[in-house]
Amino acid sequence: MSRSLKKGPFVADHLLTKVENLNEKGEKQVIKTWSRASTIIPQMIGHTIAVHNGRQHVPVYVSEQMVGHKLGEFAPTRTFKSHSKGDKKARM
């Protein structure tokens, strides 16, 4: 179920103020955040946001196609180690 339109998208307050301050100054700077649940809004386009994946901050360059998605979608939390070549059970 999607979020109500009258509420609007969720964006963490500290992240929104940092983006607005950089937009006023006209600067492009990496913004570090732990807020994976924040929705990408049009004001974030062109910025690089370092999203925490549980271990490190993954840099995410925000483009127009990302608007409406969550920041956490672009910072994977799990790494897949491939199945071993000799193990036939895992491949079937």
From Swiss-Prot:
GO (cellular component) term, any one: small ribosomal subunit
What keywords is this UniProt entry annotated with?
Ribonucleoprotein, Ribosomal protein, RNA-binding, rRNA-binding
Q: InterPro entries this protein is in?
A: Ribosomal_uS19, Ribosomal_uS19_bac-type, Ribosomal_uS19_CS, Ribosomal_uS19_SF
A molecular function annotated in GO for this UniProt entry is:
rRNA binding
One GO biological process from the UniProt record? ribosomal small subunit assembly
Q: Which SUPFAM superfamilies match?
A: Ribosomal protein S19
Note the HAMAP family from the entry.
Ribosomal_uS19
State the function annotated in the UniProt record: Protein S19 forms a complex with S13 that binds strongly to the 16S ribosomal RNA.
**Family membership:** Belongs to the universal ribosomal protein uS19 family.
What is the protein name for this chain?
Small ribosomal subunit protein uS19
User: From what organism does this protein derive?
Assistant: Acaryochloris marina (strain MBIC 11017)
